Amino acid sequence: MPGPQPSYQNMERFFIRLKAGQSMTLSAALQKHLRTTAEEAEQLLRQGSVWDSERKVRLRDGGMAVTGQLLRVDRPKFKLREFALEEGDVKYEDEQLLIVYKRGGVPVQPTPYSDTDNLLLGVQKYYEEKGIRYRAAPINRLDLPAQGLVFFAKDKTDEAAMNRQFQLHRVRKRYLAATRAFSGVKSSYIIRSDLEWQGSRKAALTYVRFCRENAGRFFFLVFPQTGRTHQIRRHFQAEVAPLLGDVRYGQGAPGADLWLLCFCYSFRHPASGKKTTVSFLPDPWRAAMGKPEVGAGLRPAR
């Protein structure tokens, strides 16, 4: 299962503004006001945790002079590392597409506290190593604590084609989810609701089918028909049971593993137009479920 899951609850935010007439280097300002060492200040700059708050840009140069600008520091409480793809993370690759596995706790793209500890950076480094001259961008997103497959393209045309398939809901997504509780009253659910996020309410639709039970865990196949923020987690909390390890919508302890996996996609290949299916079931999930096969073994329970 995934490792520790950083979150905004594990981040400290500081604002620094020098007094009128004061001037010092950025590194010195960080050391003085955050009471850090020179090495710690350099690490904050290197990992992208320091911002010019008014211009909304990251600051890197510890030797630059700061005077009256408002500085913002988003300091994580956990240790960061510069992300790189590991052997076996690439689950599909051809001349047009790259599909990689994201572990739980790994951001898909830069966060306020870092632009070095994310999947996008790992893919960009992979492109550079392979001589692929294209600026990578994730085509789909996954929640920070969730695991699963993330799409990247290798040129603008294929990226636009895949983005369009996702926007028109022509990509079939299949998830696995696990809970500790399940009433068993019914084996399938059609969950419709309006979900609010940051002041906006949008319709959400999720299909859920009970799959199997093993060792006190109940596993479900999940087919989201829309892509709202935290949609699956919120729908499970409301209609089925909170997901195992869900800190936000359940009773998971801080740092717990969220049992939510995007394991399969079916789509039209942007070059050939052929129906293509890519799936991946990590070994910990396979073991927890009683070692099913990705295809036949993951049919809903009858």
Per-range role (PLM):
Residues 2-302:
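RNA pseudouridine synthases
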